[in-house]
Design a protein with these regions (language model features):
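Internal alpha-helical scaffold of NAD(P)-dependent oxidoreductase catalytic cores
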Residues: 1-28, 32-74
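NAD(P)-dependent Rossmann-like dehydrogenase/reductase catalytic/cofactor-binding core
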Residues: 3, 43, 52-140
């Protein structure tokens, strides 16, 4: 029905793997857009120290996923980073919510993946720091 209505769809074999692939982009870009002071994704890619942090977080997500049995190729990480600057001054949904004073899905996007990574024995210190920072920034 979605495709009949013109909505592109894609069937995946494993929703958990699809979620970790989505987190490759969401964890760094949604989180750092807030933590870095409310900046758009193109700036996260253009400022060298932030671009390095984005890439490092992507690798932590990839590592955590691997500990859970999901293979996310390096090529996928590069593609996720490379498609972002052409989006322009894109503000991720978490940043939009944060700036509007709405609740940010800190637990769903950062907290739960962190806990699952840790339970699988993955060391993800950058994700730990980002999660702690976002909890403080979004506390009401």
């Amino acid at each position: 029905q979605f495709e009949a209505a013109g909505v592109k769809t894609r069937v995946v074999d494993d929703l958990n793997e699809a979620r970790w692939r989505k987190l490759v982009w969401n964890i760094p870009f949604n989180g750092l857009a807030i933590a870095a002071g409310g900046i758009a994704t193109n700036r996260l890619c253009a400022i060298p120290r932030l671009a390095e942090e984005v890439r490092a977080l992507m690798h932590e997500v990839q590592f955590a996923a691997s500990r859970l049995g999901f293979v996310i190729p390096e090529k996928f990480l590069r593609q996720q980073f490379d498609v972002t600057p052409p989006m322009g001054a894109y503000r991720p949904s978490s940043l939009v919510d944060f700036l509007a004073g709405r609740e940010v899905e800190v637990e769903a996007i950062w907290g739960e993946p962190l806990r699952r990574a840790q339970a699988a024995g993955a060391k993800v210190p950058r994700l730990e720091r980002l999660y702690a920072s976002l909890k403080k920034l979004t506390a009401r």
